[in-house]
A protein has these predicted regions:
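C-terminal alpha-helical interaction appendages
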Residues: 1-154
Length: 154
């Protein structure tokens, strides 16, 4: 059960919080992070196992607990926003294999806005927050285009 939870947590991080993935890899802290996090839910998992709770249910409950502090994902939010508002650029990044890299760069460019606006789950549906981010993303993409790193799709 412990290894399954580690694998599922790592998979979640890779897809939803790649900034954390890179940070942990840079510090060689992946194993320690996963170990510490999974240990925090093992007592609950063992209790549910002893109560004959199906493994799939245990995994789902534990993974929800393990990912609570990782939500909402700025990366996922910005990826969706990039697709909605700048679809051609999103497709270009995806085709060139730079989508994750560029979304992480956009996260960096927008980090102050995320902090000052206290990004929460409710921010996902807040049009004001979205409208605050769009000019910053546009500015980033314009700088990228001026540097020659971004080609407009035609």
């Amino acid at each position: 059960m412990e290894n399954i939870l580690k694998e599922k947590l790592w998979e979640y991080i890779i897809h939803n919080n790649p900034e954390l993935m890179y940070k942990l890899q840079d510090k060689y802290g992946v194993s320690e992070y996963l170990e510490d996090k999974v240990k925090s839910v093992l007592v609950l998992a063992d209790e549910m196992l002893s109560e004959c709770t199906p493994r799939e249910i245990i995994e789902e409950i534990c993974l929800n607990l393990l990912t609570t502090e990782l939500k909402p994902s700025r990366f996922t939010y910005l990826s969706s926003l990039l697709f909605e508002e700048f679809e051609g650029t999103y497709v270009d990044f995806a085709r060139s294999g730079t989508l994750t890299y560029e979304v992480l760069n956009i996260m960096g460019a927008c980090s102050e806005l995320f902090e000052t606006n206290n990004f929460t789950a409710g921010s996902n549906t807040d049009p004001n927050f979205k409208n605050t981010l769009i000019p910053k993303i546009t500015d980033y993409l314009n700088k990228l285009q001026k540097s020659g790193s971004l080609q407009k799709s035609g």
